[in-house]
Regions:
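Conserved beta-strand-loop-beta-strand hairpin that lines the nucleotide-binding pocket
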Residues: 1-51, 95-169
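A short beta-loop-alpha structural element at the N-terminal edge
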Residues: 49-55, 59
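Short, well-structured hydrophobic secondary-structure segments
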Residues: 86, 91-96
Length: 169
C-alpha cells in the first residue's frame, strides 16, 4: 500500500469477499461502509438551515463555541476537532451533492455528540469515493466512519439523513 494511502480498519466488502482487516481506499471497495440505520436518541443542542458552503466557517465557529462554553465539561481538543471535521464534511457533502434544503443538527447524549445532516437526495445513499487516488479527495465519509462510534443514514419525510456519533470524552 502506498504510504500516503488511507486505510480503513473496519470490516468492508471487497471484491472477492469480506475482509476483516479493512480496505485500501484507492479503489478496492465494492460496497458502502454507511449502513442504513436510525440514530440513537439525543437532545438537540444546535441546528442550522444551510444554503451554501460559504456558511460553513460560521457553523464551525458556532459549534466550537458551544462545545467549549456550553458543554458541561471540558472537551479534549482532539475530539473537538474531530467533531467539527465530521460536521463540516457531512454538511459540505450534502450541499455539494445532496440538493434541496440542507439542515445540520448537533445533538447530545450523555457521552457523545450526534451529528446529523439532511438533504433531498433520498435515492442517493452516502457513497464513499472509490477508485480514485486519495490526493483527489473524497475520503470524508471514510474518515468520519473511523472517527465515529456509530454511523448510518435513513430516509424520513422526503429527506435523507446522514448521521455519526462522536465521543465527547
Amino acid at each position: 500500500m502506498p504510504p500516503d494511502a488511507y486505510e480503513i480498519v473496519r470490516p468492508a466488502i471487497l471484491l472477492g469477499g469480506l475482509s476483516a482487516r479493512g480496505l485500501h481506499v484507492t479503489g478496492q471497495t465494492a460496497g458502502p461502509i454507511w449502513p442504513s440505520a436510525s440514530p440513537p436518541e439525543a437532545a438537540i443542542a444546535l441546528h442550522w438551515e444551510l444554503g451554501d458552503v460559504a456558511e460553513l466557517p460560521r457553523v464551525r465557529a458556532e459549534l466550537r463555541r458551544h462545545a467549549t462554553r456550553d458543554d458541561p465539561g471540558p472537551m479534549d481538543p482532539d475530539l473537538l476537532d474531530q467533531l467539527i471535521l465530521a460536521l463540516d464534511e457531512m454538511a459540505s457533502n450534502a450541499l455539494r451533492h445532496g440538493g434541496g434544503s440542507v439542515t445540520a443538527t448537533v445533538r447530545q447524549t450523555p457521552d457523545a455528540y450526534l451529528v446529523e445532516v439532511s438533504d433531498a437526495a433520498i435515492h442517493a445513499p452516502p457513497s464513499p469515493a472509490v477508485g480514485r487516488d486519495p490526493s483527489e479527495g473524497g475520503l470524508g465519509l471514510y474518515l468520519i466512519a473511523e472517527l465515529s462510534t456509530q454511523h448510518g443514514w435513513y430516509v424520513s419525510n422526503g429527506h435523507k439523513f446522514v448521521w455519526a456519533l462522536l465521543p465527547r470524552a
